[in-house]
Regions:
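Short, small-residue-biased leader/transition segments that mark boundaries at the very start
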Residues: 2-6
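Phosphate/diphosphate-binding loops
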Residues: 26, 42-96, 180-207
Length: 223
């Protein structure tokens, strides 16, 4: 089995309706829509840390004697967009939104229907900002999530996922980032629980979990 989705007829109507809503929301919240390459050189993935920390989950190939990988995440592509032109601190925060098609070599035992597949379109955003803008921006994103979840009638719970064993950066930087996320989310009255060691290799995150009709929880969004 391909472990990837084929969509047709009413499924496409639903998908396109959601995309229309996505564009409406991101325009309202001042995001710039971007599109980034599907396949990129090994050197980029080495710079981002994915080659050393995520390669087992990536689909790789060789083209003209050079290593390439299909993107499992959109993050490096957003940085390429940022580097296309010079920026001033006055431009910050810069908010990029992307509906990026990503491929991840998930273990077969982890796959689950449409909830966990090997290829999917990710509603992704990357925000370039100054350190003193972190709190306000995290609050802003949380409110965007709240608006969208409320529309669809989706209650959610929040987890703060902290530094995993396999990570980049110093413990000091991780603690600063974890504290910044915790401070921002509590300042608007949101509760969270700590999920030790479940952060991404490149940083801590606030995971937003929803519940399906069978009572199972799924991580839907993250900051």
């Amino acid at each position: 089995r391909q472990r990837q989705m084929c969509i047709r007829d009413r499924g496409m109507v639903l998908k396109n309706t959601l995309i229309d809503y996505w564009r409406q929301v991101h325009k309202k919240w001042n995001y710039v829509e971007i599109s980034t390459p599907q396949i990129m050189k090994r050197t980029l993935w080495e710079t981002s840390g994915h080659w050393d920390h995520y390669k087992d989950n990536m689909y790789t190939t060789v083209i003209d004697g050079e290593d390439f990988a299909i993107k499992p995440m959109n993050c490096p592509g957003s940085i390429l967009v940022y580097e296309l032109e010079p920026h001033s601190y006055r431009d910050l925060p810069l908010r990029y939104g992307e509906l990026g098609l990503v491929h991840r070599h998930e273990l077969s035992g982890a796959l689950h229907g449409m909830f966990r597949v090997r290829c999917f379109t990710q509603d992704d955003a990357h925000i370039l900002l100054a350190k003193d803008q972190i709190k306000d921006e995290v609050i802003r994103i949380a409110r965007l999530f709240d608006e969208a979840y409320s529309l669809f009638g989706l209650p959610y719970k929040i987890e703060l996922s902290t530094m995993p064993e396999d990570h980049i950066g110093t413990r000091e930087d991780w603690e600063k980032a974890e504290n910044a996320l915790a401070d921002a989310i509590t300042s608007i009255g949101k509760e969270y629980v700590v999920n030790p060691g479940d952060g991404a290799f490149y940083g801590p995150k606030l995971d937003f979990h929803i519940q399906d009709s069978l009572g199972r929880t799924w991580q839907l969004s993250l900051i």
